[in-house]
Amino acid sequence: MGIQGLAKLIGDHAPGAMKENEIKNYFGRKVAIDASMSIYQFLIAVRQDGNMLTNDAGEATSHLMGMFYRTIRMVDNGIKPVYVFDGKPPNMKSGELAKRAERREEAQKALEKAEEAGEAEDVNKFQKRLVKVTKEHNAECKKLLTLMGIPYVDAPCEAEAQCAELAKKGKVYAAGTEDMDVLTFGTNIMLRHLTFSEARKMPIKEYYYDRLLAELDLTQDQFIDLCILLGCDYCDSIRGIGPKRAIELIRQYKSIEEILKHIDTKKFPVPEDWPYDQARKLFKEPEVTPADQVELKWVDPDEEGLVQYMSNEKGFSEDRIKNGAKKLKNARHTSTQGRLDSFFKVMSSPSVKRKEPPKGAKGSASKKAKMSGGKFKKPK
């Protein structure tokens, strides 16, 4: 799920914290990519006639095709990707995982009805809702990455937290994922849409953490509390408090503890035994492998191994796999030239021209910051 409504909130309140970029501008950059999120995208997007790709044996291959060609696209543009795989989920995520299981059950029932009614569009929609990344998908992608010469990391817990750790400690330039909670984990730079297909023509969105805090006028602790109020994977949020109210409350009262002292809990019911403090600790002190203990090594692809696995075992065209291997090898030696700015000190918050909201526009940052002092207070 990530953080509910955070991307829109940033667009409304901190537009200068994000800029759009082209993939070619990341030449020479190392990027830690959330593997599970990418594989999920591939399983949903890489399809034929609305169905997941399979080989002659009926095995799903959408994830392998997506991983192979999207990774080649990145490497071809000089990017050095490292994929980070999820470990065991934290105990606090059990509630969110249970909700996802319930939603899949509902989608399965809806799919059966749509199939009976012959509603093709609904069938396609509910099929996608049933998609789940399995251990087998992960294992097959790890094998493929090894043959491609691309490193991967097994996170002890959440992949987003591990990506943030690698970025914060300078092991990579940025964390690449669609889950906004990588910002809550404190990554200095986040990239969205990096693994999207070229055909979608979606620009890469680059978010800067330091600039985000500055434009929101929040500390790291206040930003984490804001994300918990918006809704995260680790606990429920307060019903009735959306993004607009959440940021106003955090700006006014500075912490969830103070907010709880002042809001009308009849109007805004607080979840029973709300473990917001445990969620906060999880974001501040996630279980990760320290960046200095992670070794990243990019090597030449194993062309023979790729042909054996992808063509002979999985049914992909041998010529296409060989062409892909050549692209990987050529691009790897080109990208070793590196970036000019790698020889100089890199500033944590690049100079980005701030996108000022239109003059007099509703919801400008200055207007959002002003509020009635007793707006959310308990009735006397």
Curated annotation (Swiss-Prot):
GO biological process annotation, one example: base-excision repair
Native organism taxonomy: Eukaryota, Metazoa, Chordata, Cephalochordata, Leptocardii
UniProt-listed Enzyme Commission number(s): 3.1.-.-
Domain of life: Eukaryota
PANTHER family: FLAP ENDONUCLEASE 1, FLAP ENDONUCLEASE FAMILY MEMBER
Organism: Branchiostoma floridae
N-domain as annotated region, ranges: 1-104
Cofactor notes: Binds 2 magnesium ions per subunit. They probably participate in the reaction catalyzed by the enzyme. May bind an additional third magnesium ion after substrate binding.
Residues annotated as binding Mg(2+) 2: D179, D181, D233
Binding-site residues for DNA, renumbered to this chain: R47, R70, E158, G231, D233
InterPro entries membership: 5-3_exonuclease_C_sf, Flap_endonuc, HhH2, PIN-like_dom_sf, XPG-I_dom, XPG/Rad2, XPG_CS, XPG_DNA_repair_N
Keywords assigned: DNA damage, DNA repair, DNA replication, Endonuclease, Exonuclease, Hydrolase, Magnesium, Metal-binding, Mitochondrion, Nuclease, Nucleus, Phosphoprotein
UniProt protein name: Flap endonuclease 1
Pfam families: XPG_I (PF00867), XPG_N (PF00752)
